[in-house]
């Protein structure tokens, strides 16, 4: 027969395991998604971390796990780089880092990062554990005195030997913490396993669905073996209920020794079974009041000691062993054996288990009726014996035993000797009690004395009741006693019939049955809304407020009036979700806001964990503007759709607030509507509205680019960039169209340097480069050459803004002395221009230099500086510094490339040799202009300082002179384009080596200079 198994669906108890295992020193932890495409966002934040840092859970969720909002001036940059490297490699990492709380106070933290794997071995989460070690004597943050010296040491300790000394001291302290076993974690490799030798390290749990089951020594209460054992104990209990009254009443009737009794062996065997049952009960699981299956040995033992242990212990006392060892016993010991009848209370406990089967219930009731008749037969026999002993045996012979002996012709001699046998007397007594219980009897065995008549009256009264229960209205009594269970079985039968008629698949059938059973275990089939429907609204609102007090105590409803809360409580319903079930799916219409009362859920998108929700979390979507509510605004078809899946990890109790009911209440209380719409995005743990990733989700990770106001000059300077380094373009060649330019291939000129991705370098929170174009007030001034020639419009040439316009000569802007120059739109290396007028693909780089602001400058009206804005400003400053470093490195590479190009020019000059003109040359070159710079490459108009020799190289057009070039000609005309700079202007790139000249090669000249549009890149 089936047993109530309890809540046995597989659950993902990862969150509870982490909170239990890292309790105390490791209660401050974060969980981050290791499979995210945009960094590693935080998906769970413990309450201890919020208390440690001062940030709320909604402020931390979806931010990067590197915790940039905790950085400050004393945060070590090398330690952060090692942390980022460990994150990219999915490796364990431990470090001591100086973090800053929300109020700006600094604290030293022992950061421990561990990857979490699933059942397939894939890293799906990162676990970050934070330990405040400020009071343990960390450098630079001592509790007393010396803070200024420590800060000075911190400012100087990042360079040279001081930094190495502090690093060594921190490593030694980390080893000390490992040896004391305060911070255990799963080791990797032999050396890590030996670091903690005094205490075993707790293993990191896997993020997976836990298997149901426990130790092999535990006995599951719903297993087959437990059912067989319960059946055996049930038979033993019936045996005790039959034999104990019989032995007590008929023990002193004959002279047979007790040790020769036929039931002695069976009695001892039953006692051993009861003792063994006590031992097994200490190892048997049970179902708690909340429906959970308890498998902890300690909890099982305490529960058994508080319930049935003493009753089972008294019933299992081995009284029959006293007879084996020939210990003299009195009649009181025989009466103590009646205590074993308390085992029948366990039978009443099992009746509820087997009550779902009508046949079993009827059988048990019949057995109880027969057992009652047996007990009354034993009492009827004792009454007859006591009547014989109380009266004169020579004169008194009217008892029912005397009458039975006369009829059986075995009369009593002297009132006590002789008489019918024990067997005959028991059968006659049982016959009398059964006839009295079921009817009025037949008179062959009747009551003659007063005591016998009183007992007969009691027997008839009990018989009338038992007859009505068993034979009169068994079905009515079962329905009255088990009405709720009958309803349960009725609904279960309807559910099974529905599944059978519609032929539902087995997985769907299992889910339906599991949900029905677990829901029934929570609310016992009571529909609160149906039950409270007939109550008045005033009383029903008060009851609803009491039932939904958890969700109504949120800060979101703090500004609501009592009437508003009463109206809201009437639209709140309690729901339940089993493990593995989807509460919402992506793209579904969001019709309610959900508050998690118990259990945990996960938010998924494309099988990636976006957030883990626990008790006290609110999930839903922000409310649209007034007039756009579903069914209330101008658009009645407006529907909010979910952007992710919500799946239950454990058994979850939820309270859902209907969106339509919420809109109705907000319309009735407009004074609270504005406060609710403003506070809902702040209190939502996760926003499920589609499009919140781009518009609303940014509130979780407040990007400095989005939270801080931008300068107006920034937007007006989107087109103020430095021009490319170009060369003048001559007039069109008559009779010929534009030819494609060929890049000058320079293989193996410099060793390859690996370049990191700019996206990974700048962080995912930086806006695109097109939005970071420098303004005129923030960018260095243009060179005089550009100012004088580049900004004048030509009436005959193409307009300056067109792609075909090029300056008349090589223009290189001068470098400022305040820092690395801004990078102008530049042609990507390796992309050839087909000669069209379309703009070539380019990258735009710009930098906004930090403008000094007077310290006395007050913040704008209505704004106050906060630690959060300060941390965001520090983050922006850090990213800008890193961008400047990258730009400087790129400029150095461009400078190196320029020097190599100059070296190649020198080699070409030596290869071509002195100029010469054959007599039959058809190309008459123009004399070079002594006032013009060489068109191929030229230094800047003003030499930059020696410390800044970085130059930008974008495009170098080297057009040849107009005409047809023959072999051995135009050497004299080509020399100006490849000559070194004028002696009067020193080369900022350094002297270029020019080897000795060599005779010209016709093939080289023919392939090198074919048209005036050949270019070098």
From Swiss-Prot:
Catalytic activity: K(+)(in) = K(+)(out)
Gene3D superfamilies, alphabetized: 1.10.1200.260, 1.10.287.70, Jelly Rolls (2.60.120.10), PAS domain (3.30.450.20)
Positions on the Cytoplasmic side per record topology: 1-228, 281-302, 354-361, 504-1017
Mode of membrane association: Multi-pass membrane protein
Regions of compositional bias (Gly residues) in chain numbering: 139-148
Segments forming domain PAS: 14-90
InterPro entries: cNMP-bd_dom, cNMP-bd_dom_sf, Ion_trans_dom, K_chnl_volt-dep_EAG/ELK/ERG, K_chnl_volt-dep_ELK, KCNH_animal-type, PAC, PAS
Intramembrane region list: 428-448
Compositional bias segments (type: Low complexity): 772-787
Gene Ontology CC, one term: plasma membrane
Chain segments carrying region cNMP-binding domain: 556-620
GO MF entries: voltage-gated potassium channel activity
Ranges that cross the membrane: 229-249, 260-280, 303-323, 333-353, 362-382, 483-503
Subcellular location: Membrane
All ranges on the Extracellular side of the membrane: 250-259, 324-332, 383-427, 449-482
Start-end of Polar residues biased regions: 691-724, 1008-1017
Entry-linked NCBIfam families: sensory_box
Function per UniProt: Pore-forming (alpha) subunit of a voltage-gated delayed rectifier. Activates at more negative voltages, exhibits fast prepulse-independent activation kinetics and deactivates much more slowly, but shows no inactivation.
Assembly notes: The potassium channel is probably composed of a homo- or heterotetrameric complex of pore-forming alpha subunits that can associate with modulating beta subunits.
Entry's family note: Belongs to the potassium channel family. H (Eag) (TC 1.A.1.20) subfamily. Kv12.3/KCNH4 sub-subfamily.
Name recorded for this polypeptide: Voltage-gated delayed rectifier potassium channel KCNH4
Species in which this protein is naturally found: Homo sapiens (Human)
């Amino acid at each position: 027969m089936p047993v109530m198994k309890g809540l046995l669906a597989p659950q993902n108890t990862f969150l509870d395991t982490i909170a239990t295992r890292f309790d105390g020193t490791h209660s401050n932890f974060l969980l981050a998604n290791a499979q995210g495409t945009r960094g590693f966002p935080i998906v769970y934040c413990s309450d201890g971390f919020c208390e440690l840092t001062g940030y709320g859970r909604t402020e931390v969720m979806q931010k990067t796990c590197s915790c940039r909002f905790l950085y400050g001036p004393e945060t070590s940059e090398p330690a952060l780089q090692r942390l980022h490297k460990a994150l990219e490699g999915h490796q364990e990492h431990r470090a001591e880092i100086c973090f800053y709380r929300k109020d700006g106070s600094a604290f030293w933290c022992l950061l421990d990062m561990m990857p979490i794997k699933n059942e397939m071995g894939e890293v799906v989460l990162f676990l970050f554990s934070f330990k405040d070690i400020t009071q343990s004597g960390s450098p630079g943050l001592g509790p007393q005195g010396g803070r200024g010296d420590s800060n000075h040491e911190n400012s100087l300790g990042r360079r040279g030997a001081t930094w190495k000394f502090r690093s060594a001291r921190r490593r030694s302290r980390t080893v000390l913490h490992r040896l004391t076993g305060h911070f255990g974690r799963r080791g990797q490799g032999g050396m890590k396993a030996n670091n903690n030798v005094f205490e075993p390290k707790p293993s990191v749990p896997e993020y997976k669905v836990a298997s149901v089951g426990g130790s092999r020594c535990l006995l599951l209460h719903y297993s087959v073996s437990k059912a067989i054992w319960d059946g055996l104990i049930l038979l033993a209990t019936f045996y005790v209920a039959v034999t104990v009254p019989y032995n007590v009443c008929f023990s002193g009737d004959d002279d047979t020794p007790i040790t020769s009794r036929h039931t002695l062996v069976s009695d001892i065997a039953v006692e051993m079974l009861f003792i063994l049952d006590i031992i097994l009960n200490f190892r048997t699981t049970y179902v708690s009041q909340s429906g959970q299956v308890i498998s902890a040995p300690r909890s099982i033992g305490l529960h058994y000691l508080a319930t049935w242990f003493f009753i089972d212990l008294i019933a299992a006392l081995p009284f029959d062993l006293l007879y084996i060892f020939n210990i003299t016993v009195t009649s009181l010991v025989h009466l103590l054996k009646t205590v074993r009848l308390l085992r029948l209370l366990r039978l009443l406990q099992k009746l509820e288990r087997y009550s779902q089967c009508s046949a079993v219930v009827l059988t048990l009731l019949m057995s109880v009726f027969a057992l009652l008749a047996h007990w009354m037969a034993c009492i009827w026999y004792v009454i007859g014996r006591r009547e014989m002993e109380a009266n004169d045996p020579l004169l008194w012979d009217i008892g029912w035993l005397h009458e039975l002996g006369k009829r059986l012709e075995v009369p009593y001699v002297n009132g006590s000797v002789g008489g019918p046998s024990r067997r005959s007397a028991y059968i006659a007594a049982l016959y009398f009690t059964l006839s009295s219980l079921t009817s009025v009897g037949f008179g062959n065995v009747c009551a003659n004395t007063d005591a016998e008549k009183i007992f007969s009256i009691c027997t008839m009264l009990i018989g009338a009741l038992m007859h009505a229960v068993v034979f009169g209205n068994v079905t009515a009594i079962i329905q009255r006693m088990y009405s709720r269970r009958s309803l349960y079985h009725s609904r279960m039968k309807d559910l099974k019939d529905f599944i059978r008629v519609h032929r539902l698949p087995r997985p769907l059938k299992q889910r339906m049955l599991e949900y029905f059973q677990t829901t029934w275990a929570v609310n016992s089939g009571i529909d609160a809304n149906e039950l409270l429907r007939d109550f008045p609204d005033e009383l029903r609102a008060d009851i609803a407020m009491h039932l939904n007090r958890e969700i109504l105590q949120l800060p979101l409803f703090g500004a609501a009036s009592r009437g508003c809360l009463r109206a809201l409580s009437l639209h709140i319903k309690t729901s339940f979700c089993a493990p593995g079930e989807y509460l919402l799916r992506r793209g579904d219409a969001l019709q309610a806001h959900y508050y998690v009362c118990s259990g945990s859920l996960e938010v998924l998108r494309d099988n990636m964990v976006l957030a883990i929700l626990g008790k006290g979390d609110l999930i839903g979507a922000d409310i649209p503007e007034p007039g756009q509510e579903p069914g209330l605004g101008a658009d009645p078809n407006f529907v909010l759709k979910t952007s992710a899946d919500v799946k239950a990890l454990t058994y979850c109790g939820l309270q859902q607030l209907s969106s339509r009911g919420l809109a109705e209440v907000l319309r009735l209380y407009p004074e609270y509507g504005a406060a609710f719409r403003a506070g809902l995005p702040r209190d939502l743990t996760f926003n499920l509205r589609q499009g919140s990733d781009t518009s609303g989700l940014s509130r979780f990770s407040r990007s400095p680019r989005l939270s801080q106001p931008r300068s107006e000059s920034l937007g007006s300077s989107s087109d103020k960039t430095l021009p490319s380094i170009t060369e003048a373009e001559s007039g069109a060649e008559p009779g010929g169209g534009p030819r494609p330019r060929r890049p000058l291939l320079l293989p193996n000129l410099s060793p390859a340097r690996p370049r990191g991705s700019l996206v990974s370098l700048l962080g995912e929170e930086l806006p695109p480069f097109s939005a970071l174009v420098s303004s005129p007030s923030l960018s260095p001034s243009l060179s005089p050459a550009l100012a004088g020639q580049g900004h004048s419009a030509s009436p005959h040439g193409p307009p300056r803004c067109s792609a075909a316009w090029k300056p008349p000569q090589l223009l290189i802007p001068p470098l400022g002395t305040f820092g690395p120059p801004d990078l102008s739109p530049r042609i990507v290396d390796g992309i050839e221009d087909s000669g069209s007028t379309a703009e070539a693909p380019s990258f735009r780089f710009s930098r906004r230099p930090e403008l000094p602001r007077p310290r006395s400058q007050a913040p704008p009206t209505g704004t106050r500086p906060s630690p959060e804005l300060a941390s965001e400003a520090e983050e922006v400053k850090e990213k800008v510094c890193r961008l400047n470093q990258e730009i400087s490195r790129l400029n150095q590479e461009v400078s190196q490339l320029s020097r190599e190009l100059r070296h190649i020019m020198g080699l070409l000059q030596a290869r071509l040799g002195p100029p010469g003109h054959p007599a039959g040359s058809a190309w008459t070159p123009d004399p070079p202009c002594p006032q013009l710079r060489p068109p191929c490459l030229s230094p800047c108009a003003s030499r930059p300082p020696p410390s800044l020799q970085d130059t930008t190289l974008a495009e170098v057009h080297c057009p040849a002179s107009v005409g047809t070039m023959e072999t051995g000609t135009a050497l004299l005309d080509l020399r100006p384009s490849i000559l070194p700079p004028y002696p009067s202007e020193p080369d900022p790139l350094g002297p270029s080596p020019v080897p000795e000249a060599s005779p010209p090669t016709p093939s080289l000249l023919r392939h090198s200079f074919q048209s005036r549009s050949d270019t070098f890149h």
